[in-house]
Every structure is written in structure tokens, then in C-alpha cells.
């Protein structure tokens, strides 16, 4: 299983973003995407970091670009152009 780190910025309050993120948990589980860490930088709730474990990075990419999921992430305040995605070694 690959690990993927996403660092991103959000435009809405962290609590709102996290609530929407959590609401997608069952959808992520259906495609074997597991949350390892979800949080924000100390002192900066607008800069979030998420570490996922995935069967392969393409599964996560497909999930993120699914129109329904993308719309929900946009509603949560995700600033997509700020996102940096790093596939980590095992």
C-alpha cells in the first residue's frame, strides 16, 4: 500500500472543512483509501495536511477528480491550486 501526503490550503473554517472531509469517509473506504493523519499546521488552521494509505496513487486521483467528490471538496473550501501531492516510499 502506498502512502500519499497532501498539503493544501482552505478558504473556510477548519471545522467546516473537517466536517465535510469526515462525511466522505465511507466513500473513501469503498475504494480502500485509509486516513493515517488529518490535521492542520500549529497556529494556521488554513494549511492542512492529510496522509492517506492507498492501494495505488491512481485510486486516490480518481477519487479526488470524481465530479461528486470534487464538488464536495470545493464546497468545503479546498483551494485546489494550492494542493501539493507527494507519493511517499514505503
Where are these regions (language model features)?
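Short S/T/G/P-rich N-terminal loop/turn motif that feeds into the first structured element of a domain
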Residues: 1-70, 79-90
Amino acid at each position: 500500500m502506498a502512502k500519499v501526503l497532501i498539503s493544501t490550503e482552505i478558504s473556510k473554517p477548519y471545522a467546516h472543512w473537517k466536517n465535510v472531509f469526515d462525511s466522505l469517509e465511507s466513500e473513501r473506504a469503498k475504494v480502500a483509501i485509509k486516513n493515517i493523519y488529518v490535521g492542520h499546521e500549529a497556529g494556521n488552521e488554513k494549511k492542512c495536511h492529510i496522509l492517506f494509505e492507498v492501494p495505488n496513487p491512481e485510486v486516490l486521483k480518481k477519487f479526488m477528480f470524481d465530479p461528486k467528490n470534487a464538488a464536495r471538496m470545493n464546497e468545503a473550501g479546498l483551494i485546489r491550486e494550492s494542493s501539493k501531492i507527494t507519493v511517499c516510499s514505503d
